[in-house]
């Protein structure tokens, strides 16, 4: 069994914010494959899908971003899921809007939702699907940026990023994180 966790904030007022790209991807995965009804469990919205014969829980913590681990840690322990089987999808300001980067582990990179997961899971060794939201405008704070909706002109890139991430998550669930990174991470151009 695996957990696929999308990070975000609960509530209508946050639905379309950049910080909620993880929730958007989870919803898009659920829209693309058959799933069980959503239910409330361990302070999260949870449903399950089957990928390649394996049960996969789709998870949207309802604890607010900075406390996401308070939901994910207990779910992981209840279902006896190894950290390497907890796939986390979240926003990344260091990537251009809609771009995807998959990593097998790593530090929080200053992301408070990931800090919370690391704290409650007890390790940095869980796969990440980082979805780009771009950098804030010069006059904006980081908080203003992540809690604002995507601009109208970036919607095409956002939708492509969500679609690409859905494909990458489902594909990686089938082939594993190493092959998934090779298959779905952007290819590096050769140095000249």
What residues fall within each predicted segment?
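Conserved TIR/SEFIR loop-to-helix hotspot centered on a Trp-containing motif
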Residues: 108
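Active-site proximal helix-loop segment of RNase H-like, two-metal nucleases, encompassing DDE(D)
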Residues: 144
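Nucleotide and nucleotide-moiety/phosphate-recognizing core
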Residues: 2-105, 115-129, 136-141, 156-192
């Amino acid at each position: 069994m695996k957990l696929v966790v999308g990070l975000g904030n609960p509530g209508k007022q946050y639905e379309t914010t950049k910080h909620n790209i993880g929730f958007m991807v989870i919803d898009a995965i659920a829209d693309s494959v058959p799933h069980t009804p959503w239910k409330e469990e361990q302070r999260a919205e949870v449903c399950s899908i089957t990928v390649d014969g394996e049960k996969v829980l789709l998870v949207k913590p309802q604890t607010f971003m900075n406390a996401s681990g308070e939901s994910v840690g207990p779910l992981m322990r209840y279902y006896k899921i190894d950290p390497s089987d907890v796939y986390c999808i979240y926003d990344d300001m260091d990537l251009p809007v809609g771009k995807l980067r998959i990593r097998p582990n790593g530090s929080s990179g200053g992301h408070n939702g990931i800090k919370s997961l690391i704290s409650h899971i007890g390790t940095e060794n869980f796969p990440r699907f980082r979805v780009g939201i771009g950098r804030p405008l010069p006059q904006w704070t980081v908080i203003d940026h992540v809690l604002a909706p995507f601009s109208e002109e970036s919607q095409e890139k956002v939708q492509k990023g969500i679609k690409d991430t859905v494909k990458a998550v489902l594909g990686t669930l089938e082939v594993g994180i190493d092959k998934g990174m090779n298959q779905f991470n952007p290819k590096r151009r050769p140095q000249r």
